[in-house]
Amino acid sequence: MGSEMCIRDRVAPGDTVKAGVVISNSEVGLGSVSVQPLIYRELDGNGIAVAGATTKRIHRGRVNSAEEHFMLASQEVLTEADRTFLTELQETVRSATDEEQFSQIVTLMQSAKHQAMNTADIPAVVHTAGRDFGITDTEQNGVLQRLIESDDLSLYGLANAVTRHSQDVESYDRATDLEGIGFNILSMPPRQWTRINQIAA
């Protein structure tokens, strides 16, 4: 594929984000590939995985053995099923980096930046949000630390603290989960954010 222009925008001065994707294969290795939009934050290298927007593609042709995965196939040895799969995968990646969808998410981030956190009891905000979104007590401690370090006491700051903490988690699968949880926090209904803040009052 030829080079394409990077899709990027600013959430705030000095805070640039750009469109990306997470591509993962199935655990059993049967030719299933998932493509999920990712918003990459240049400031700290965090990625927010857009939950609910994952697309799956399944390779309908022959599945290679583990040894064959280390071989680069030329166009001559690709089967018709291979070519179809690769074409569909390319289209899925393009769709995942759709500029309109990216702009909508940036607008969501900009809005969250202005949704202040109740600072009367910041640990209570983190604990309540963690309980709502399936973040463990140990992870909550890490999120709290990252939140305080960022000095961004807003809904946007909380979501970024979760994705920043994902970089400290040993399990890749759990880190990926936390990137998705970051988006779920970012996009929570306003009344849920209000309730979380009220509990911490």
Predicted segments — roles?
Residues 2-6:
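Short, small-residue-biased leader/transition segments that mark boundaries at the very start
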Residues 11-201:
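Intrinsically disordered, low-complexity regions enriched in serine/threonine
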